[in-house]
Amino acid sequence: MARSPGRAYALLLLLICFNVGSGLHLQVLSTRNENKLLPKHPHLVRQKRAWITAPVALREGEDLSKKNPIAKIHSDLAEERGLKITYKYTGKGITEPPFGIFVFNKDTGELNVTSILDREETPFFLLTGYALDARGNNVEKPLELRIKVLDINDNEPVFTQDVFVGSVEELSAAHTLVMKINATDADEPNTLNSKISYRIVSLEPAYPPVFYLNKDTGEIYTTSVTLDREEHSSYTLTVEARDGNGEVTDKPVKQAQVQIRILDVNDNIPVVENKVLEGMVEENQVNVEVTRIKVFDADEIGSDNWLANFTFASGNEGGYFHIETDAQTNEGIVTLIKEVDYEEMKNLDFSVIVANKAAFHKSIRSKYKPTPIPIKVKVKNVKEGIHFKSSVISIYVSESMDRSSKGQIIGNFQAFDEDTGLPAHARYVKLEDRDNWISVDSVTSEIKLAKLPDFESRYVQNGTYTVKIVAISEDYPRKTITGTVLINVEDINDNCPTLIEPVQTICHDAEYVNVTAEDLDGHPNSGPFSFSVIDKPPGMAEKWKIARQESTSVLLQQSEKKLGRSEIQFLISDNQGFSCPEKQVLTLTVCECLHGSGCREAQHDSYVGLGPAAIALMILAFLLLLLVPLLLLMCHCGKGAKGFTPIPGTIEMLHPWNNEGAPPEDKVVPSFLPVDQGGSLVGRNGVGGMAKEATMKGSSSASIVKGQHEMSEMDGRWEEHRSLLSGRATQFTGATGAIMTTETTKTARATGASRDMAGAQAAAVALNEEFLRNYFTDKAASYTEEDENHTAKDCLLVYSQEETESLNASIGCCSFIEGELDDRFLDDLGLKFKTLAEVCLGQKIDINKEIEQRQKPATETSMNTASHSLCEQTMVNSENTYSSGSSFPVPKSLQEANAEKVTQEIVTERSVSSRQAQKVATPLPDPMASRNVIATETSYVTGSTMPPTTVILGPSQPQSLIVTERVYAPASTLVDQPYANEGTVVVTERVIQPHGGGSNPLEGTQHLQDVPYVMVRERESFLAPSSGVQPTLAMPNIAVGQNVTVTERVLAPASTLQSSYQIPTENSMTARNTTVSGAGVPGPLPDFGLEESGHSNSTITTSSTRVTKHSTVQHSYS
């Protein structure tokens, strides 16, 4: 088919357009000739619509802004078609990191560089150029642009390590490679800029030069100089690296350290310190050190080249010795590991060879020649102990022995002396015999049977019974040795086979029954057994058959499965044909099982009936019903009945407990404010019309205040502040002498007892209540005093009718068996116990006769204070504090100084006064003091000699009082008493008459007449060191800061007051009892003789609490 000419022309035109048509052209606008990599083109060359150009080359580290634009792309379609073409570049430096390296003009296609290039960071840039129309579509094929960064020598070599470490053996051959060092250069590889050259800068030690360095590879080799570790163990090299093939430039040069350690080789032969060695061992010793072999080696310490290796050359064929190396000291330790006997060998000679643990170096291997080292060991003879020739012996006995064999000798276990080989003098005892089969003769070691052997005993293991025996030598030091006796028991056939489980239960669907027997005898008198079923009752052997038999058991099978219980008799014989006389019976129950849960319980009909116990109880109940009418016949009926006879004296016998004292009586308390002659009233807390007295200064706790009398509670105890009465003021204090008001009633707890300090007029109105209160207070104080010397055996108690808490030690502890309680107060218990005394004595008691007997002189003391409280007429309350100086002479005892004054009945009252706020100083350890503390106490009383007949107590009778006593102690605070240290004691007595009589000094009791007045004493005592004054009161051993309470009570009845009791005029009564308690003082001191041995400068407190017919002085620490 012929083609048309028009188509041929169209094809030709298309070819022409393809060859001549527009394309994207790249033009490199500038190049550098010095690179010699890119040829210079005077014009663009077209190859099939694409411009092929060489890559662009730019040098690093230069300012390239003067060379912009470095490239340009252009499309011919812009002129041919008149299109608006925009150009774009992508790639590293523009759209990929690092950004901002290049910028382009989208209209002209020019590419500019904006920063200095770094080849080490980016050695090559690959960009892609695009020609885009207005819609962003490519109008030309994208064109690649390669930009290479040319390198410059801007980096120096850097070592990979600051310190290189290597090693080489000593005695190494020349040119031995030691190690290789390495450095890197960041410039372009395989160029002159990155070619590194190495060099050794220095070497320590510098001479001789033992290493050289390959400058191109960095390898270090040894020279021909021989390395010796014993001379230099290490070397240090300083090396440097330069690029440019070692060209010297002004760039800094990096250096590194190279440390080379010389390795040790076994090139030294060990040397022994001593050529001949000796040692000594005791016989019969083992694991003891004999000697040490000292070795020297010049090789590296601790290495195998240094450690010595010892071997026996000769003499140790018996294996007596062992040698090992001490890794710390490199010494050979020779140890005896096998006992030697002096009698057999007295000397041991052997030799050893010394080498190293590591093999010798080839350089000295031919020079080493082993030399034996002789060692001589002497055996020391010692006194040996005892021993058994054999530590274990065997004795054979039979189980068939009868009782006559007990005590039979079955063997002996003799110990021998190792030195002489003769039997030793020793004692033999059993160490272990669990079933006490034997006895051992302690002298001859003979072993006797103490119990018949039993093969079946649980202590027999495999037919052997074990006993251990200890032999103790008689010589000193004693030595012991232990031996073992094995008693082999010969078994006899004395046991027959028996069933292990004679009662069994199986389910009806079980095929077999396992029947097992046992025999306590051993082989051959036990298994295997023979089993046979005895046909009793007939047919049993057919019903139960033996299906399979083992050594000691059989499997029994039932021919007919039938529920119920069966008793199957067996004949079981042992291996010797011996069987038990009685047949072995197996009680077997075959039952129906429910799903494997066991047999179903058999159903039985329930039966309810009375048992024998129920019938017996019914008969017993019937008999009891018959017995009740018989008991009713014995009761009294009608007139014959009698009532209960009351027990006489039930009111006295059934004493109402927890009720102390008589019931209180309600009485009206009259006014206690008398009017004096001047019309002034006595205040509620004081006494009017008191004379002014000077106040005593010092450390005393007693304050004398003008016109005032009061009590206050300070620091847990009572302190009294009062003033002196003088002149006519005492005439208006009332018939009973009461100077305390009703509002000053307080409880003093310093003595440990409850004391009611009510006024004397209140006692006159409620006499019975006050009497009982005083009585129980005295008794409680006495019991408390005794309790302080004993450990408390009960706790503090509070009774229901007490006004305050109980004492420190309860009055329940009033009877200590081991104590020394003075029970003489039972001699006179007062009127309250008169009825009880008459009942006990069976006779009437005359009270007046008893009082007349009491008026006779007596020397023994009692506690009868409450029984005479009805006669109280004057109450004086005072409390003074004495401060002692630094030291005083040691006083005499109180009994010796005042024995003549105690001529009548003496009543002792004790109290304890404490002052908690005052710190108690620790007494100094002075055994004796150089001075004394003297306190003088004297009482003078007078009264009418007419026997009184009645008791009259009333407030209208004038009376006189004891007002005060003063004590001056030598102390630093008593500066206002210049005569306090003169060493004198002054006692001043004043008498105040009821009708205004003045007070005159008295010389003694001989001036007092039997007139109706009461002497009031004002005494001034000076506590001062005085050798000429006889003390009447010795102070206890007290320390600084402690207190001593002195209590004085004085009663003197006035003639105008009728009294039922009389104190004779010619007698003077003073009683003192001192109780010392506190640190360093155990308790009461007898005979009132208290000496001061501790530190002085103490405080003494004197207080008067109430008036009795006696005088009591009390001392106590606080």
Curated annotation (Swiss-Prot):
It comes from the Eukaryota. Keywords: Calcium, Cardiomyopathy, Cell adhesion, Cell junction, Cell membrane, Cleavage on pair of basic residues, Cytoplasm, Disease variant, Glycoprotein, Lipoprotein, Membrane, Metal-binding, Palmitate, Phosphoprotein, Repeat, Signal, Transmembrane, Transmembrane helix. InterPro entries: Cadherin-domain_protein, Cadherin-like_dom, Cadherin-like_sf, Cadherin_CS, Catenin-bd_sf, Desmosomal_cadherin. GO terms for cellular component: apical plasma membrane; cell junction; cell surface; cell-cell junction; cornified envelope; cytoplasm; desmosome; extracellular exosome. Disulfide bonds: none annotated. Residues 50-609 are extracellular. One of its GO terms (biological process) is positive regulation of protein localization to cell-cell junction. Pfam families: Cadherin. Residues 1068-1077, 1095-1118 have a biased composition (Polar residues). Palmitoylated by ZDHHC5 at the plasma membrane. Desmoglein repeat repeats lie at residues 881-912, 913-942, 943-968, 969-992, 993-1021, 1022-1051. Three calcium ions are usually bound at the interface of each cadherin domain and rigidify the connections, imparting a strong curvature to the full-length ectodomain. A component of desmosome cell-cell junctions which are required for positive regulation of cellular adhesion. Involved in the interaction of plaque proteins and intermediate filaments mediating cell-cell adhesion. Required for proliferation and viability of embryonic stem cells in the blastocyst, thereby crucial for progression of post-implantation embryonic development. This is Desmoglein-2.
